[in-house]
Regions:
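Phosphate-binding glycine-rich loops of NTP-binding sites
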Residues: 79
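Conserved beta-strand-loop surface patch within small alpha/beta domains used
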Residues: 1-76, 85-146
Length: 146
């Protein structure tokens, strides 16, 4: 079970609101060190293009990001992005996660993150060993530390 400080959730929502402006999707990554992978420590906002109905991460940014993660001993644990209304995992979300590893989590925040800070009406899904996605309860995967 991942542990995340409340400040990271607040930072996530602030970034979503600033980037998306209640008009566009936005995506972030939650990181943790390899020597303590269950304690999330950092939010990363990738360079991306976005619209109301999708986004694309810049490939040059991703290449540099992998190098930075290796140098700093960090790994991506959860990708987090917004949707314009209801939170769900679209076919595009299923097909293009940052990682395709079993157990990788994708969290979708509804309403471009303009609602209350937290996981109300959010959707969490996890890659299964066969490559499919399965919705999982947020409380079974993430603990918020006040």
């Amino acid at each position: 079970m991942y542990r995340i400080p409340r400040r990271m959730i607040e930072q996530t929502f602030a970034t979503f609101r600033s980037c998306g402006g209640n008009q566009r999707e936005c995506q972030l990554y939650w990181l943790s060190p390899w020597d303590n992978p269950l304690v999330l420590t950092e939010v990363v906002h990738p360079k991306h293009w976005s619209s109301r109905y999708g986004l694309r991460i810049e490939s040059d940014w991703i290449n540099q990001f992998w190098n930075d993660l290796a140098e700093r001993g960090l790994g991506v644990r959860i990708q987090v992005h917004t949707h314009p209304s209801e939170a769900f995992h679209s076919a595009t979300d299923d097909a293009y996660p940052l990682l395709f590893d079993a157990g990788f989590l994708s969290l979708v925040i509804p309403d471009f993150a303009m609602g209350p800070v937290g996981f109300c009406n959010a959707y969490l899904t996890e890659i299964q060993p066969d490559g499919s996605w399965q919705q999982v309860a947020i409380a079974e995967r993430i603990i918020v530390d006040e």
